[in-house]
Amino acid sequence: MDAEKATDKTNVHLSSDHERCPVEEVALVVPETDDPSLPVMTFRAWFLGLTSCVLLIFLNTFFTYRTQPLTISAILMQIAVLPIGKFMARTLPTTSHNLLGWSFSLNPGPFNIKEHVIITIFANCGVAYGGGDAYSIGAITVMKAYYKQSLSFICGLFIVLTTQILGYGWAGILRRYLVDPVDMWWPSNLAQVSLFRALHEKENKSKGLTRMKFFLVALGASFIYYALPGYLFPILTFFSWVCWAWPNSITAQQVGSGYHGLGVGAFTLDWAGISAYHGSPLVAPWSSILNVGVGFIMFIYIIVPVCYWKFNTFDARKFPIFSNQLFTTSGQKYDTTKILTPQFDLDIGAYNNYGKLYLSPLFALSIGSGFARFTATLTHVALFNGRDIWKQTWSAVNTTKLDIHGKLMQSYKKVPEWWFYILLAGSVAMSLLMSFVWKESVQLPWWGMLFAFALAFIVTLPIGVIQATTNQQPGYDIIGQFIIGYILPGKPIANLIFKIYGRISTVHALSFLADLKLGHYMKIPPRCMYTAQLVGTVVAGVVNLGVAWWMLESIQDICDIEGDHPNSPWTCPKYRVTFDASVIWGLIGPRRLFGPGGMYRNLVWLFLIGAVLPVPVWALSKIFPNKKWIPLINIPVISYGFAGMPPATPTNIASWLVTGTIFNYFVFNYHKRWWQKYNYVLSAALDAGTAFMGVLLFFALQNAGHDLKWWGTEVDHCPLASCPTAPGIKAKGCPVF
């Protein structure tokens, strides 16, 4: 049956008013109908899904090592497979075949929307969460390229697959809390739902463009436009006019630089820059945008300037105001090779001779905000969601109040929880085996693995609640590395491994949960979702590691920005941040930086501050229950206004806030019909057009060395923004005070 006609035929369920989803954004976008007769796991779905998965993981792994990395989202394949699927529906034979008593057809009918969703689930496995590749590849890259460690391919495969499958196990256990409840609505999925409907549903004639025509127009415009910031006029990514007005002022450039400063007055006209770190602002709820904005303004425009110019906190003026580099006390780059033993441990004598490690002021304060964010998340979820979570724990799932989407999903068999327990037990067993067999390579003992699993189990639910309701994911990378850094000081590899099991398994779990909610909205049978996610995860993991291994073995001086090839396109900026984190938390260790006598010891108080701050908000919400805006004050999301900087810049976040405010406040409130019809379609079109042009520019021009060099290709014309201002500190291209 054609998906376009599904609403006219059998087994269509319509809601009554009391069944409608109480979340307005969901009610406006997600269809309240289903056709259970549509085939899902067809030959087309398997072929196109696995092809999309392999192609995306290859491209994303390849691009992530580039000096200008590019993440290609699943939206690219989501669009590309539609004409291919329809072509296969027209040309493949419709004959039924029997295999071991199982009847199937290569062509069961027209290409339908549920097949398309399953293909996208496969494709999402080829993108992984956020970075375009498995996070464990970051640890493997740091081990091989930065620490020059000899690591076996089998050990690397264990690391990649166990972290991914462990996350899937957490996701299965937490479905009843983060997928089934109505209030867990996962805002980012609405863009996907809107795009699927635009591609498959026939709209009644109405004023204005259909969603499909609007999507194609926006896609074409985005595709053409990205040639400007992506190649011809890159300065559009960081438009820092303050630096042009005061070309000789260090202070003005520190304040106004969009790339190396606070970004006051700077802006970006590059969609990739707007959506790079917090995702598309068009899919974030207005309350979330407002909370992030409050945190951003407090941090960038009040806290950082006061600490830098007023109090010189942490010897701030010795270093650039904004940098992810590590420094010596004299403001020079910190050379970690001088303090490493051949076993990749800290040489304490060499460290004492070489000197302490220092951070840029914004980097240090951003780490402190991570301390507050972790405890604030636990307190916030305990206070605002604890009672509901407790009730769901001790009551049968079937007694949970269901909206129309939950009722429609009752037509399908659920996935038994023991299927997920098997995956969880298998990944835990393989991880523990790895800690014994490759003990020297991973440095993390078996009890460290168990501790990482326990930490992931504790935090996945509260962080999932925040992401499912606000579209923001409070990270706790810093906390995991902080804890194990105290327990196992001087062991950077152990710190990396602990991070990917204790933190990144949570990231993967939340990615899988988001896809499960997408399947819930699109009425995909849960067992089909299970199969697609599991197979896609394993295939993507193997290809991901294979491509990364090939590149690490075949490209000379990959990730070496200070070697014989300073202009190499393979400088791995993303993995440089991972390496820096392993030095801060693993090699040097939190005791030396944040313990008694450490330069950054006072930041530890932010653990307590973060734990306390949600309490008055919760108390006010109980005292004034009619003030519906009080519970919308979300301390973890406010602290997320500082998250990701660096490598995110203030200009990235400020532009995200402005764009989100325009669409999810003004357009949503004053042009709701336009917002309902086009908002999420526009988000998908901007992502897709940018991705298509990014791939084209790379293969047609940049990979062939056809780079432009003129005024418009400079980053932001703020050469003095990275200069220190303390007396006697020397830096290249900077005056000495």
From Swiss-Prot:
Sorted alphabetically, which PANTHER family does this protein's record hold? ISP4 LIKE PROTEIN (PTHR22601)
One Gene Ontology term of the molecular function aspect = oligopeptide transmembrane transporter activity
> Per its record, how is this protein called by name?
Oligopeptide transporter 3
Gene Ontology cellular component annotations, sorted alphabetically: cytosol; membrane; plasma membrane; plasmodesma
Organism equals: Arabidopsis thaliana (Mouse-ear cress)
Q: In which tissues is it expressed?
A: Strong expression in flowers, leaves and roots. Preferentially expressed in the vascular tissues of seedlings and mature plants as well as in pollen and developing embryos.
How does the protein associate with the membrane?
Answer: Multi-pass membrane protein
Per the record, the similarity remark reads:
Belongs to the oligopeptide OPT transporter (TC 2.A.67.1) family.
Q: Where would you find this protein in the cell?
A: Membrane
Keyword Membrane applies: yes
Q: Which InterPro entries match?
A: Oligpept_transpt (IPR004648), OPT (IPR004813)
The protein's role, per its UniProt record? May be involved in the translocation of tetra- and pentapeptides across the cellular membrane in an energy-dependent manner. Also acts as a metal transporter that could be a component of the copper transport machinery. Essential for early embryo development.
Entry superkingdom: Eukaryota
Cited Pfam families: OPT
Q: Does the keyword Membrane apply?
A: yes
Identify the main location. membrane
Induction of synthesis: Highly induced by iron, copper and manganese deficiencies.
Q: Which UniProt keywords apply?
A: Developmental protein, Membrane, Peptide transport, Protein transport, Transmembrane, Transmembrane helix, Transport
